[in-house]
Amino acid sequence: MLTAHHLDVARRHNVILRDLSLSIEPGRVTALLGRNGAGKSTLLKTFAGELTGSVAPNGVRVTGDITLNGEPLACIDARRLACLRAVLPQAAQPAFPFSVDEIVLLGRYPHVRRGGATSHRDRDIAWQALERADADALVGRDVTTLSGGELARVQFARVLAQLWPDDDAMEAGPRYLLLDEPTAALDLAHQHRLLDTVRAVAREWRLGVLAIVHDPNLAARHADSIALLADGTIVAHGTPRDVMTPAHIAQCYGFAVKMVETGDGAPPVMVPA
């Protein structure tokens, strides 16, 4: 399990997260929701290990405990951590004209022996990851020529390649996928396809997934659990049906909604009241 316990994060005098506790369970998708500036990306970066130790930005102070499979996150070296968790940030725009294939192969480098090169197996995994991300038609393209949605799917393939299961990976224990607004640049169909894939690999590969999603209806349909972030802490965490209530949404967003049952067994759809 990937767990934050009594987490506090401050940037100089600005408290961003306060006394926050949350666990990401293997095999399940947790959607993180909250208004702009609530601290969602900060929480994800903290879970990723990007705000502690030598990589901590100036002025950032983090207290509390974060453990990955029972081990303090700060004690895991960078290479092993890259084999245990993958991160898809909001803006992953390459500055150089790499090919789609090269970008996805970057996900395999934590698994390459020091001083070695990617293998035929790595290239096969990259191709399979592109297929699962519905990005295989983009192979050979210069990534600087891709649309925002095309690039998002390629970057999603990269993190799939990073966590692709093999014997060594499975022996290392549960692994984790951290996604910061993975659907933001995608059209309607690709939003649902990507989150369908996320849920499928969470179960197949025993991944714990934390995904920041802005659309509550999208989150409710695809996540196993939802965590609502407000005032620097988790104000509700549970199943979509339990969390996505008018009272919780009003508390989190200051916006009135009502719930409409769809009749297909899925959680109710949220509409303005």
UniProtKB/Swiss-Prot annotation:
Record-annotated ABC transporter domain positions: 2-256
Keyword ATP-binding found: yes
PROSITE patterns linked: ABC_TRANSPORTER_1, ABC_TRANSPORTER_2, HMUV
Membrane topology: Peripheral membrane protein
Molecular functions (GO terms): ATP binding; ATP hydrolysis activity
Any Pfam family: ABC_tran
GO cellular component terms, semicolon-separated: plasma membrane
CDD domains tied to this protein: ABC_Iron-Siderophores_B12_Hemin
Keyword Lipid metabolism: no
Entry-linked InterPro entries: AAA+_ATPase (IPR003593), ABC_transporter-like_ATP-bd (IPR003439), ABC_transporter-like_CS (IPR017871), P-loop_NTPase (IPR027417)
Keywords associated with the record: ATP-binding, Cell inner membrane, Cell membrane, Membrane, Nucleotide-binding, Translocase, Transport
SMART domains per record: AAA
Known EC number: 7.6.2.-
Localization (cell): Cell inner membrane
Superkingdom of the source species: Bacteria
Record-listed ATP binding positions: G34, R35, N36, G37, A38, G39, K40, S41
Main location: membrane
Family: Belongs to the ABC transporter superfamily. Heme (hemin) importer (TC 3.A.1.14.5) family.
Function: Part of the ABC transporter complex HmuTUV involved in hemin import. Responsible for energy coupling to the transport system.
Subunit composition and interactions: The complex is composed of two ATP-binding proteins (HmuV), two transmembrane proteins (HmuU) and a solute-binding protein (HmuT).
Protein name per UniProt: Hemin import ATP-binding protein HmuV
Source species: Burkholderia ambifaria (strain ATCC BAA-244 / DSM 16087 / CCUG 44356 / LMG 19182 / AMMD)
Organismal lineage: Bacteria, Pseudomonadati, Pseudomonadota, Betaproteobacteria, Burkholderiales
